[in-house]
């Protein structure tokens, strides 16, 4: 009997850390101050004006926000400034403090570039291009340290720190405009020297994070999650190679950060396959979806059309959100979900004089035509609830769940009352519509 009790206690000790992991949900709101200052009009689902969007997000159950940081966005190309590149340190300190003062956690997203950093472009900041590799590593450390010191002094200490944005292929490849053959990418076929240079830069970034913000968790962010849309990622080859390289280089980090946009990354099943591999290969790491999105109106051009399952509509976006959350909640190591550019809202702006970007973004959580919050916004908080919305819960939904939500018979919560005929669960009862 004693051995059985001891075994049970050991088993509980093994699972309790996973079960007790705190979850975080919110979005990247890096342009929110610009929208507010320029006069964007925000409304809730019922059409009531939102005086303070950040407070509204908190009321909707969100508990964390993400903000990007560029080294010197004044040196970004004009086209990219028109896409929303403006987040210098002063801007980020102010927004970061607002987030912290609202009682939310802050994820700071270092881009280590003057403009967008992603798999297609990771250009060295203009003021750093003349440095050799050793000097560049030192600059990365000192810049990271100095930024974090200023953030702390301003009352905007980050809780999560991304040391690079979508750095699947490395970062700081070289000067913008340099010949392609002179850029130091980290592809599957790249020379080992490129990977060594990259991990040395990353080591200095993470070192500064530990020195200045020892309580913050470090995020390594990639986006190789598709086996159908990303040709170097068959059987998740690029994803596997990346984190194996990080292990070999002994990179210090806590969280695996991923991006997922169906129009670029394919089906949700592909994302889940990536998560399954990562949680098995790196059980000591947390996993966060640090960028996600899907359209509620007007499609975004990409390589994959998911409208056969999720139409471009408020309900389609809501159903996508419900299914994404249900999938993520099947994986205990997944502890974060952030919707990218959730604040985009053209309603109320004078397009000629007060526009924030030069084009609409159609996967935000506000309708650009009306300024109303989409249904998906209020669904995000479901990620924080323990348990999952699947078939196993139908009995609970039918017999005990006396709330105003609508569910399908397989346990999926709908963003609003169903518009198609069928059998649903509502207020604990089966209902025919």
Residue ranges of model-derived segments:
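Sec-dependent N-terminal signal peptides
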Residues: 4-14
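C-terminal tail/sorting-segment detector
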Residues: 421-433
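Hydrophobic faces of well-ordered beta-strands that scaffold small-molecule active sites
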Residues: 25-29, 65-67, 106-110, 159-163, ...
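Residue-level detector of functionally pivotal "anchor" positions at catalytic/ligand-binding pockets or at interdomain
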Residues: 387-410
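Substrate-binding cleft and catalytic face of glycoside hydrolase catalytic domains
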Residues: 56-194, 199-225
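Glycoside hydrolase catalytic-domain groove-lining segments
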Residues: 51-54, 196, 211-218, 225, ...
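Aromatic-rich peripheral "rim/lid" segments of glycoside hydrolase catalytic domains that contact
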Residues: 42, 180-181, 273, 277-284, ...
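Boundary/entry segment of secreted carbohydrate-active catalytic domains
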Residues: 21-56
């Amino acid at each position: 009997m004693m051995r059985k009790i001891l075994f049970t206690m050991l088993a509980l000790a093994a699972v309790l850390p996973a079960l007790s992991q705190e979850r975080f949900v919110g979005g990247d709101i890096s342009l929110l101050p610009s929208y507010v200052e320029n006069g964007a009009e925000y409304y809730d689902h019922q059409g009531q004006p939102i005086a303070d969007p950040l407070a509204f997000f908190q009321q909707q159950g969100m508990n964390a926000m993400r903000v990007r940081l560029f080294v010197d966005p004044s040196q970004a190309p004009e086209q990219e400034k028109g896409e929303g590149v403006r987040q210098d340190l002063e801007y980020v300190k102010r927004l970061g403090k607002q987030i912290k003062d609202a009682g939310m956690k802050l994820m700071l997203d270092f881009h280590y570039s003057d403009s967008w950093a992603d798999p297609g472009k990771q250009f060295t900041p203009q003021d750093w291009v003349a440095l050799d590799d050793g000097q560049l590593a030192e600059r990365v450390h000192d810049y990271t340290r100095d930024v974090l010191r200023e953030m702390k002094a301003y009352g905007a200490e980050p809780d999560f720190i991304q040391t690079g944005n979508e750095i699947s292929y490395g970062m700081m490849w070289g000067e913008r405009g340099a010949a392609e053959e002179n850029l130091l990418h980290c592809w599957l076929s790249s020379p080992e020297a490129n990977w060594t240079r990259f991990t040395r830069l990353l080591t200095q970034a993470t070192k500064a994070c530990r020195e200045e913000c020892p309580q913050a968790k470090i995020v390594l962010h990639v986006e190789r999650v598709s086996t159908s849309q990303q040709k170097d990622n068959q059987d998740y080859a690029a994803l596997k190679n990346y984190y194996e390289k990080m292990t070999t280089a002994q990179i210090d980090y806590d969280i695996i950060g991923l991006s997922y946009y169906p129009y670029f990354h394919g089906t949700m099943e592909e994302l889940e396959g990536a998560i399954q591999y990562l949680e098995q290969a790196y059980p000591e790491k947390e996993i966060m979806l640090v960028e996600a999105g899907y359209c509620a109106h007007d499609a975004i051009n990409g390589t994959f059309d998911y409208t056969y399952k999720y139409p471009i509509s408020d309900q389609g976006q809501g159903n996508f959100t419900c299914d994404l959350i249900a999938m993520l909640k099947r994986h205990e190591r997944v502890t974060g979900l952030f919707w990218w550019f959730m604040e985009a809202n053209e309603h109320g702006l004078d397009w000629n004089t007060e526009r924030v970007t030069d084009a609409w973004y159609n996967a935000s959580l506000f309708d650009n035509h009306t300024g109303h919050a989409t249904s998906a916004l209020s669904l995000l908080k479901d990620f924080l609830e323990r348990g999952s919305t699947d078939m196993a819960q139908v009995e609970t939904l039918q017999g005990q769940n006396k709330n105003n939500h609508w569910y399908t018979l397989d346990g999926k919560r709908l963003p609003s009352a169903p518009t198609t005929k069928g059998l649903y669960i509502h207020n604990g009862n089966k209902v025919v519509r």
